């Protein structure tokens, strides 16, 4: 309700996360809603952060260990230092941008691994952020047969052995040695393992994967939930 300052910017909520100050962030079709700790919701227009009139529908919101905010959606990835202050230092990573290119504009998941490396899952495979160059490194990953790949990557996490698990749509689940992947040259990287309908999965549309304390990996598929 536009008459109520405590209402949401839009009823379609794609992502919610809590930052270190206990503020609640909501990514919506019309921008960002911020619920400050013990305060009312605050509407933050994207233009206030970027200084442009371009929009984005946010699917994944994240604040990394260095204090940077990362908001990804249907129109690329925003990086900025503070959404409501006077200094934003916003950078917009998008396909075709000469200064800040990205493999795909659709961002599904933003993840920081155990060594504080930042990864994103996109509809153009996965990318790792290089804090030195401030650019993203793109990785193409395939299974050992060349049948499946990590295009349409939906989710990422790192296990206790240093392997990245990558959930995809139509490609199954990929398990890769993170350090070998980072040391690989440009081109296709063959995953250490791939889960598909041929070896345990009930489907190939994987929305999310999550490890538990017992070492199981829970897999959220379209209309079903399994663990491996």
Predicted regions and their residues:
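Carboxylate-rich, polar loop motifs that coordinate divalent cations or form catalytic acidic clusters
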Residues: 1-228
